[in-house]
Amino acid sequence: NGEYNNRTFNIGVAYKIDSKNTISWQTQIYNGVQHYPIFSESMTKTKYISDTFRSLVNWNFRTEKVQNIFRLAYLEDEFQYFSNINKAKSSGGSAKIYLAKNDFNYIFNEKLAFNFIGEYQLNKGQGFQSGITNVERNAGSIAGLVRWNPSQKVNFEAGLKKDFVEAIETPVLYSFSGKVNVNNWYSLIFNASKNFRFPSFNDLYWQPGGNLDLKSETSLQADLGNRFQYKNFKLNVTPFYINIENMIRWLPNSGGIWSPSNINNVESYGLESQLDFVKDFGKNNAKFSLGYIYTNSKNVETNRFLSYVPQHKIFGNASYRYDFIEIFAQGMFNGLTFTSEDEKLSSALKSYFVMNAGLHIKILKHYQIGFKANNLFDQIYETTAYFPLPKRNYAANLLINF
């Protein structure tokens, strides 16, 4: 009930032609089988099979003043849905993406640089007994960036971007960012941008649940990072603000099917913070990290919290390494999370704390074995309604570096 089996294969090869040119090839193959959980013995068991293929060819040309990266990629996804695991598939579909991208950088001098990016992709989709015939879409974009570093303590970046999507109107986008090293212990980082996202094939055609009436999503966002450093300590504190028009969100509908829809206006603000400590002494290394995230994300029209966006999240990591052995611990607290915009406490996900711990042992030069206990305190918790995650479980791995 709810079992799954995932397999992934990766391969990568690179060849340096000369001092200026390098080519590389990377490929990933993935297969996954997911049995959806049932909540009573009378329900019919269902399953979902997905297959993914990714392949990327990369040509990197570099001189003292010029760097150009040209990429060609092919991506393919296929899914099969079985409304009864003992019968033939009831629906399915496949998507193919052909992609070409060129990233050109020119260094004018030590203070000024330019970046031009062009991209084109052809998207194709096909369905099986899902209401989808053959669909196809052309999309592309051009972007320009200017990087200016007037001094070692100050740098800025500004950019413009225009998307071109078949049958969809697109706005001109912009971004601006900068960093100021005020002194040796404090830095200020700021970012502001206008962003755009058009509905993907999954958003439009996924069956069951796709929505052909979706609008494109636009947003304005800004954040202000504050970085403090003292000896072995680093502290990052970043307030942020986001305003989104026609936000695309996948949520369960009245029939229990996950489906995307637009939310007219969403306003989100909050704070991200993280404290880090690193100390080396002899063969010893100690690391500690503690973070807190506060998010207030609401539908402006209803003034209610968005579902599946917790207000409070705390996370931490600690590790100690001596020579060839390392022990570590990871912890996360997730606050109360609403699962619908009516803010019903009865259906909200309860807050939870999960902790993992383990060790790594390095054997010889190229081998490392690891052991890990997940959900150490055997908590019962959910990140999605009605889908409880595993209780205490264990994992072992072997890492070989060639």
Residue ranges: model-predicted function:
Residues 151-153, 241-243, 262-341, 365, ...:
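Gram-negative outer-membrane beta-barrel transporters
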Residues 1-8, 14-97:
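Flexible loop and strand-edge segments within Gram-negative outer membrane beta-barrel domains
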Residues 177-179, 225-229, 274, 390-402:
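Outer-membrane beta-barrel "beta-signal"
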